[in-house]
Amino acid sequence: FHSQKEIYDHLEDQTFSYSGPTSMGKSLLMRIFMKDKILNGFTGNFAILVPTKALITEISSNIVNEDLKNDLSTHNYKVVTSGNSLFLKQNDLNYIMVVTPERMLYMLMSYPNISIDYLFIDEAHKISEADGRSAFYYKVTDMLIQRNRKPKIILASPNIPNPQVYLEALPYNQNASVSYLRTSFTPVSQMKYYLDILNHKFYAFNERATSPDESFFEISGISQHATCFSLIQAIINKDTTKSNIIYCSGRERAVDLARQYAASLPYLNDKKLNALAKEVEDEIHGSYYLADLIKKGVAYHVGYLPLHIRTTIEENYREKNIKTIFCTSTLIEGVNLPADNLFILSYRNGQPNMSPVEFRNLIGRVGRIEYNLYGNVFIIRYSESQSEKKIKELLEKDIPEQKISITSGLNETEKNYIVNQLKNGSTEFTQLSNQNSESYDLMRKVGLILVRDITKDRNSVVRKSFNDYLDNDGISLIKHNFLNTNDDKPKPDDDINVSLDQTQNLIIAIKGGLTYPALKNGKVDYNDLLSFLNKLSRIFRWDMYEKDTVGSNRLRYYAVLLTQWMDGYGLSQIMQQAIDWNKNNYGSVKIHGQLVPYNNSQDHQNIVIGDALGIIENVILFSISNYFLLFSTEYKELVTAGSAFDNDWYEYVEFGSTNPLTIFFQRNGITRDTSDYIRRHHEYYIQTKNGYRLKSDVLSCGKESVEKELKEIQYNVPELFV
């Protein structure tokens, strides 16, 4: 297609920003470009920044399994998805990094000599979001252009009318030669329908209408007895070969609606689906609703599902074994699940309303250039709480021009507050009145970027955005406050997750003798762990900075799950322990926002399982993992002269094990579950002077998920096999 060729020809530009419909295959163009460069002898490093871990898995797997395969080793490339990878310690390799901006920041801090030649920022519209995550884009790009090799930067965004705005997020010296392109061409066709059950009308939407009165035309009435599910079922039954996605506003809603929808459906007795259902029962819990739904060709797709379960569901959906998926905003965030029919039951993304960008990104799931060229979108209004006006606006109105978050996300009061705190010598930013948690997170991280840029004399994007709030005297005062300090007071650094008051508390604690507790018989002791977490809570002031996660009143429960996670328990064991804990400790579950005493019913068990999976994903593997990383990094700096040390609990959290063998295989890119499977099957590995190696027999071990994963690993790490 002409528009794709036009974009492809710009990927060698020094700086290029482009936007187009979700369906045009923007990330596919990046992958084709990288493959072409590598096969033609280019030696250098690529990085793709993506907003979610789900996209890391999808894109890295496509690069390894579809694009390069054995060409990776032939051309001396490794695909890297984490800063813990052993490959980053080798100086003779080329890298394709697929990471989130947060992971990229820690990789750049840990490996100051690594440069990136091509930086692709996928889903670049995230730079517009007024939250703390957008701050990482400013930080990472600024750090990269300070490196020996300045990268070429390519930004890709969906449906944005002004893609050139994201060039404003890049440092000034990166923008000497820039280009941008917007295309509205899509190679796929969509039909959009609005089903108003309350008014009993079925409309088609006309995108070519010249006036609002012509946008919607009624094609039929809707029965007085129709329900949301009866309409969905009637449409699906017209062609049962079609794939269907049903969008819901939240995880609880997606699970509830999936169960209601599947209640009247028969079991399919499909061998592949039954095997997947058995895997869900074995690896999560026998009472978990998802397993029963899968047997009927139905599933739900929510963020807390274990990665390999989620990807296997996606594969079965693409192969049309699973025909209908109920999903949440994980789908908006770029996971490539193509649909013939998309049913939208809410215009909310969690609690807030969907933005026009999110809505266009969502409906872009219908009709995908790699899968199908035609699809239908059905927006269903079935409740008075749904605004007819809002639904029609989302369909009719174009996406407004976007701004970067540093421009639109911070107001004058917030910027003045940041400057005044820095003038007072403090990076302790407290949440302002009427400030939501997302804006507070952005303000705090921007403040930490600003003080670092001022003390380093960097004329960064963030620094320039404060030009109207800082004069020369103010800059001199801030430099004096943060550079003329004694050795005990930390200087500003590149880590925007932690402020100097937190770092100073940590330094004092480590100098005072704080260490990770010793293991007892090779295991983590719950009481020792809880005591250590309480110390970290005071050091890092979680009550102030982490109110919604580790600063909440659930730390004892988090410690229960974390102990089992670090000791290498399987998910099914952890889920059963979580159920038992709630049963034995008079726990409670939240249903529709209300706390209800736990009664050990299957409903309550499923709520506990969902909650526990969410804690592992969002609290243990994100919040707690980050704080343990901070502790370990500072401990190395102060105690071990930068060297690795025994009993590093950050590793135990990150890898979910204290076992060196399991950790070794995960450092080579193998997942926790597969690494643990290998540990339990001695016949599949040997120990050499260079570490553990896998026997080729493991590729036919009989466990499908293990075989599939290790075949991918064999392309990326062939030296791991004997």
Where are these regions (language model features)?
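N-terminal helicase ATP-binding lobe
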Residues: 1-722
